Amino acid sequence: MLRRSKEERTLKENLLLASSTALAAGITNVAGMIAFLAFTTNVTGHVANLAKHIVEQNYRDIIVFLVWLLLFFAGAFLSSFIIRSYKHTSDYKAHSIPVVIEIIVLLFVAIYGHNFYSETALEREVVIGSIMFAMGLQNSLVSTVSGGLIKTSHLTGLFTDLGGDIAEWFHPKARKTVTVRDKIYVRLTILGFYLAGAIVGGLLFDLIDFAIFYIVPVILLVILYYDLTIIKLRKLKRRIDQ
């Protein structure tokens, strides 16, 4: 899922990356909403709330929303910076480092929320900020790896792109190319798995509370392990062939 980027990627690799990261984003967003009463991937909504607080001159809330937005931006910036820095050595290494950082951040959220969270305003703001940083990392990573095709938490853009792709597919004067078909498959996969993750997040939070945040790092570890398994199998095959 992380070994190749952009045009080198197969449909299978894009579908696997889209489904796993969209599932993780859906779980995180809904669990964050239930736990902290804030959508942790809804940057558009946070900008709207920021504008509202500016109008109402709620200075503390203005600072909070600015920090949240900056943390999402920081996650996206860091992810892209790391990928560009390590791209010349190994695609897998360049793409896996942001995932490892995301796992660490979400484990912090899971451990703190499950064991120490006492529902104070400051704790809530710090945890939401941490999740937004992690989602910035993930969004930037999958977008960069897929050449902008996959954005697992940006559903407004997803519906816009999906509408355009389906219009192109059904238009009588447009060619029904494999590229357009594959884009539709990927976008529908993101939508379906994000919705599934959101449903799972809502149901499981009632049962296991903050322990649900342990599930997302497990999904991300599976993404890392999937590519490591393929790399090991290829090395084994080369040894056998020799």
Give the ranges of each region predicted by the language model.
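Alpha-helical transmembrane segments of multi-pass membrane proteins
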Residues: 2-242
